[in-house]
């Protein structure tokens, strides 16, 4: 039996905030770049990127497989093409519109088997020539090659030819009581059994020819044919389903790696760095990390980000500063890299180290819904409460101006209580905010577990859109006033 698992996602559930992640982190842009218009690749990528659970072992397993796929990209793309074309060909050639008719089931299943047996030969050829080294792809190759060889394929092709019944259905039966036919057994036609010499040497045999106008007789023969093929139909249909499931499973598993190959090509085209994330407890470090969705939108390399934090337990990265300084873009870049890292993929950075494989949550601004019976601040609190219900130690929460829909004093108090509780619970927080009171109190209280990033401004006032470590300054007072006080 062929068994393999290229993804090792198990029965992992989708992330609780999957829709928010797609929207806030612009993941659909990344998926579109990886899929290249292939809907199956897009579907599998959304599924893997938005997994709630990701263990260090599963991440390492997929990372090794991604590296292997990139080294053997021709083999992976060829296998995916074979699986895709096979599934499509079977869908075009097989029409089981009467599943209870044994004759039709055998005929249609054989149509599909003929296609798939030929494709198996192509799969074997690719696997024999490939040089896979990862556990995932070596396991797949071994399972296929251990169960399928040239002898098996030759036998399968011969069986398909026999099941065509080009010379009619040959079978034997026992004559039971009252001359009732019993125990039909399909017979394998003898080789050369229909040539002239064999007919000349054949002993006398009883032959009954049905009159062309005998409709009742034709119905009886049709019923006999169905009766004889009933058991065979079940076996043939199981074989068809088994092979069809193999090709569907193969192309779905490979789709993830086809997307990785496509995205790698995109990185090369734009000159983006590609790093495979490392896991190091208590450390968050990245250098020259780019916002991938922005790069996709602009077709260029945007301003990169750097950070190096060494702490035990939860911590907070707080970002503040003037509008249009790259703060939200930074938040998206972090979130995208975390999601890619958990999927076992490379990220757009020279280096990327994360402290845990926890789940990622986002709390970004939403347009006010006029149909709600409560205000915008209540909506923010309600949405954040839903996030808190699923949080665990080691998870990540990305907050973009959360709780800013109320006044500065109330917003600062709520923000301080929330962020402090998250950090104390071992959660990693990234928070973009203008709340000056919160910044002063929280950073003083959590100076060992928090870092403040501000947009870099040169001496001549030019903004570089890079973020550097800093401290709250009154220089952003006008921006804050415009944000919260202007009406």
Predicted regions and their residues:
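Conserved amphipathic alpha-helical "coupling/scaffold" segments
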Residues: 1-172
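ATPase nucleotide-binding head domains, primarily ABC-like/P-loop NTPase cores
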Residues: 281-487
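An N-terminal domain-start capping segment
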Residues: 51-91, 174-208, 343, 424, ...
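Regular secondary-structure segments
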Residues: 91, 233, 385-389
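An acidic intrinsically disordered interaction segment
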Residues: 75-86, 217-227, 444-447
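Active-site regions of enzymes building and remodeling cell-envelope glycoconjugates
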Residues: 26, 198, 447-449
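Assembly/interface hotspot detector across virion components, adhesins/toxins, and nucleic-acid enzymes
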Residues: 1, 22, 257, 453-457
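Conserved P-loop NTPase architecture
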Residues: 95-289, 293
């Amino acid at each position: 039996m062929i068994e393999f698992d290229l993804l090792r996602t198990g029965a992992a559930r989708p992330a609780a905030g999957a829709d928010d992640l797609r929207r806030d982190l612009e993941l659909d842009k990344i998926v579109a770049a990886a899929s290249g218009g292939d809907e199956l690749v897009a579907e599998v990528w959304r599924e893997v990127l938005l997994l709630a659970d990701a263990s260090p072992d599963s991440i390492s397993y997929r990372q090794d497989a991604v590296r292997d796929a990139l080294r053997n990209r021709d083999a992976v793309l060829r296998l995916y093409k074979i699986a895709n074309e096979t599934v499509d060909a079977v869908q075009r050639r097989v029409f089981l519109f009467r599943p209870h008719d044994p004759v039709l089931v055998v005929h249609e299943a054989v149509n599909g088997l003929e296609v798939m047996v030929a494709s198996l030969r192509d799969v074997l050829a690719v696997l024999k020539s490939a040089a896979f080294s990862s556990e995932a792809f070596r396991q797949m190759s071994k399972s296929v090659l251990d169960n399928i060889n040239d002898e098996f394929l030759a036998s399968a092709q011969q069986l398909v030819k026999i099941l065509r019944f080009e010379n009619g259905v040959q079978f034997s039966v026992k004559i039971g009581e009252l001359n009732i036919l019993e125990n039909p057994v399909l017979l394998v036609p003898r080789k050369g059994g229909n040539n002239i010499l064999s007919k000349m040497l054949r002993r006398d045999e009883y032959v009954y020819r049905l009159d062309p106008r005998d409709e009742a007789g034709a119905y009886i023969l049709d019923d006999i044919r169905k009766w004889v093929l009933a058991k065979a139909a079940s076996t043939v249909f199981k074989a068809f389903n088994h092979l069809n499931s193999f090709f569907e499973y193969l192309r779905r598993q490979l789709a993830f790696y086809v997307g990785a190959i496509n995205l790698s090509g995109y990185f090369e085209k734009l000159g983006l760095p590609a790093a495979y994330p490392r896991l190091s407890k208590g450390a968050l470090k990245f250098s020259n990390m780019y916002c991938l969705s922005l790069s996709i939108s602009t077709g260029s390399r945007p301003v990169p980000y750097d950070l190096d934090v060494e702490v035990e337990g939860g911590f907070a990265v707080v970002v503040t500063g003037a509008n249009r300084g790259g703060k939200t873009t930074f938040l998206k870049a972090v979130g995208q890299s975390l999601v890619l890292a958990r999927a076992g993929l490379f990220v757009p950075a020279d280096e990327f180290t994360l402290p845990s494989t926890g789940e990622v949550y986002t709390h970004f601004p939403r347009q006010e819904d006029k149909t709600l019976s409560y205000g915008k601040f209540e909506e923010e609190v309600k949405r954040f409460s839903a996030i808190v219900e699923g949080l665990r130690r080691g998870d990540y929460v990305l907050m973009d101006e959360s709780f800013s829909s109320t006044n500065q004093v109330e917003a600062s108090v709520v923000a301080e209580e929330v962020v402090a509780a998250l950090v104390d619970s071992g959660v990693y927080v990234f928070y973009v905010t203008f709340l000056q009171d919160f910044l002063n109190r929280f950073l003083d209280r959590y100076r060992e577990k928090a870092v403040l990033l501000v947009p870099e401004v040169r001496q001549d006032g030019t903004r570089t859109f890079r973020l550097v470590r800093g401290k709250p300054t009154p220089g952003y007072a006008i921006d804050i006033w415009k944000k919260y006080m202007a009406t």
